A protein has these predicted regions:
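His-Asp-centered metal-binding catalytic motifs of divalent-metal-dependent phosphohydrolases/nucleases
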Residues: 50, 67-85, 90, 94, ...
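Short alpha-helical hairpin
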Residues: 15-33, 46
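An amphipathic alpha-helix signature
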Residues: 24, 28, 51, 55, ...
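Non-catalytic interface/linker regions that flank or bridge core catalytic/transmembrane domains
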Residues: 2-22, 220-222
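Post-HExxH zinc-binding segment in Zn-dependent metallohydrolases
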Residues: 101-107
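Divalent metal-dependent phosphate-bond-processing catalytic cores, especially two-metal-ion Mg2+/Mn2+ enzymes
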Residues: 5, 35-64, 78, 107, ...
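Short gly/ser-rich anion-binding loops that grip negatively charged ligand groups
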Residues: 40, 84, 88, 105
Length: 222
């Protein structure tokens, strides 16, 4: 799910002390071989999509500093690495992996902390406290307002069902409605691009829930 013109074959220049491309290649390989095949939504394809969107958003938001762009890109590629270890609390696990791994690639303690702050900001409810964190948060959930929302959300439904985290379609639509109601985009670029479509999608889901029949043949009140 890569955006044309925003792919991963155009690496960002990094300060020489950081072996960023090697760090990125390492985690992509780890995700490719280590993620569960039942991560239908949170697979490698999601990480690559988020990375591409994050870099596109950074350009649109006027981020030009080479180090900032490199740290954002690294954070995007590592933001779901915690799924290699756990499902619940994967953000914290991802940060632990970052702290263990990235010193070997020349990242300083301060750079690693900046990456972890970005990763932890993606934990729900999102609480980004910097421009880079806002960009990563918006990239992570960019699909909520995109034309490919349906197939992507279906993959999440399949993933949650496989883990028995939701019982049926009605619970799924309730979950979606609650999530879309409380979610917000952070960057001006994403608000302009995605917010209206996301709201229209929420309106359709709420209408669907309102028309959902009870077992007795009556309709739900939502």
């Amino acid at each position: 799910l890569l955006y044309v013109g925003a792919g991963l074959d155009a690496p960002v220049s990094a300060p020489s002390r950081m072996h960023a491309q090697a760090a990125e290649a390492y985690i992509v390989q780890e995700l490719r071989r280590g993620l569960s095949p039942t991560l239908y939504y949170h697979g490698l394809h999601h990480t690559l999509d988020v990375t591409a969107v994050a870099m596109e958003l950074a350009a649109a938001e006027g981020v030009t500093d080479a180090e900032a762009l490199c740290l954002l890109r690294t954070a995007a590629l590592y933001h779901d690495a915690g799924f290699l270890r756990t499902y619940q609390g994967h953000e914290a696990e991802g940060c632990e992996l970052v702290r263990v791994t990235l010193p070997d690639f020349g990242y300083s303690p301060d750079q690693i902390e900046q990456i972890c702050v970005m990763i932890m900001a993606t934990q729900y409810p999102q609480e980004p406290r910097s421009q880079l964190a806002e960009i990563l948060c918006d990239a992570d959930l960019d699909y909520l307002g995109r034309p490919d929302f349906e197939p992507i959300s279906t993959s999440l439904f399949k993933e949650l069902t496989a883990r028995e985290l939701i019982a049926d379609e009605y619970e799924w639509y309730q979950l979606q409605a609650n999530f879309l109601t409380h979610h917000r985009y952070w960057t001006p670029t994403t608000v302009a691009r995605r917010a209206a479509s996301k709201q229209a999608r929420l309106d359709r889901i709420l209408a669907l829930l309102a028309a959902w029949p009870n077992p007795d043949g009556n309709f739900q009140n939502v």
